[in-house]
Design a protein with these regions (language model features):
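N-terminal "domain-start" segment that seeds a small globular fold
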Residues: 1-24, 48, 96-98
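Short, solvent-exposed coil/turn elements at secondary-structure transition points
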Residues: 17-19, 71, 105-106
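Short active-site neighborhood of thiol/selenol oxidoreductases, capturing the structured segment around
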Residues: 26-46, 65
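Structural microenvironment flanking redox-active thiols in thiol-disulfide oxidoreductases
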Residues: 42-92
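Short, internal strand/loop/helix patches
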Residues: 66-68, 81-117
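Thiol-/selenol-based redox modules, centered on thioredoxin-like
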Residues: 111, 118-157
Length: 157
């Protein structure tokens, strides 16, 4: 399902290179593709999406991609271990720079985004003001990619 509603909540985090971010203010694109993941195995879904999203961003100026593994607050005390393990497993510096782990009260974080299903990944297209202008989820499909590209090509004001 591709719908558009919601606002990205304000949250502080770091990427896997250690750079601090205050989101959504620090999203760098005019439009930002946000990949929310909730379980380790969902990285396999992201890995299938990644080359398609990279190609899409390359075709559209001002589009940036961010991966946001989203974990409950209780994991914050082992944040260095989790982030270090993720960073060690990602060879690409670019991928580490765009991966920002979120440690938070997931219900409070996900509610404004309209995300209720953590059984798969969620894809969001977020503008500079933090507005969600498109939403999709799940395994890669050419139809979902086409819907995302259409939203990028003609964003709503």
């Amino acid at each position: 399902m591709q719908s558009k509603t919601g606002t990205f909540p304000s949250i502080e985090t770091r990427n896997l290179e250690g750079r601090a971010f205050r989101l959504p203010t620090d999203f760098e694109g005019d439009l930002n593709i946000i990949i929310l993941a909730f379980q380790r195995w969902q990285q396999d879904i992201i890995d299938v999406w990644a080359p398609h999203l990279d190609a899409l961003a390359a075709r559209h100026t001002g589009v940036c991609i961010y991966e946001l593994p989203t974990l409950a607050n209780r994991y914050r005390m082992v944040q260095r271990f989790i982030d270090g393990g993720m960073a060690a497993g990602i060879a690409s510096r670019e991928a580490r720079e765009r991966t920002l782990t979120i440690y938070t009260d997931k219900r409070r974080f996900l509610a404004p985004l309209g995300v209720t299903d953590e059984s798969t990944i969620t894809l969001l297209l977020v503008d500079r003001q933090g507005r969600v202008v498109w939403r999709g989820s799940g395994e890669y499909s050419s139809a979902t990619l086409a819907s995302l590209e259409a939203a990028i090509a003609s964003p709503t004001p």
